[in-house]
Design a protein with these regions (language model features):
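An amphipathic, aromatic/His-enriched active-site/gating alpha helix that lines ligand/cofactor pockets
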Residues: 26-35, 54-87
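Short, surface-exposed ligand-recognition loops at beta-strand->loop->(often short) alpha-helix junctions
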Residues: 8-19
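Residue-level signal for secondary-structure boundary sites
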Residues: 13-15, 59-61, 93
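Glycine-rich beta-strand-turn "strand-cap" elements at beta-sheet edges
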Residues: 38-47, 73-103
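Intrinsically disordered, low-complexity segments enriched in polar/charged residues with Gly/Pro
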Residues: 13-15, 26-27, 39-41, 74
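Short, well-ordered beta-strand segments in beta-rich or mixed alpha/beta enzyme
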Residues: 2-7, 38-65
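Short, flexible segments with low predicted structural confidence
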Residues: 1, 15-16, 32-33
Length: 103
């Protein structure tokens, strides 16, 4: 399972963002089931960043959000992410992927 959270970060906020995003990547990396967690910057648009993590399974990813430390490190940062779907899995694991109802 792959989780990709993208961020648009103004240059004057980059230093603070990188510090918080590195802490989030380290937090993810310390959680059971996390295969890798990386903070990456776009090659063409320096204001575009991603926090990308790979997980053994979706359950491990979801459990990484449990607990007080997760609320302190992950939630404030991820609330700044671009609002778009962020979780991906092998199509065989996903099955028929139907959009959620907006009503």
């Amino acid at each position: 399972m792959l989780a990709i959270s993208r961020f648009r970060v103004a240059p004057d906020r980059a230093v603070d963002f990188v510090e918080r995003a590195r802490a989030a990547a380290a937090f993810f990396a310390s959680r059971p089931g996390c295969v890798a967690a990386d903070l990456l910057q776009n090659l063409d648009d320096p204001q575009l960043w991603t926090l990308t993590s790979r997980w053994a399974d979706v359950g491990s990813y979801r459990r990484s959000f449990s607990g007080y430390d997760a609320k302190l490190v992950l939630v404030p940062l991820l609330s700044e992410a671009i609002d778009e779907p962020s979780a991906y899995a092998d199509p065989a694991e996903v099955g028929e992927n139907l959009p959620r109802s907006l009503s």
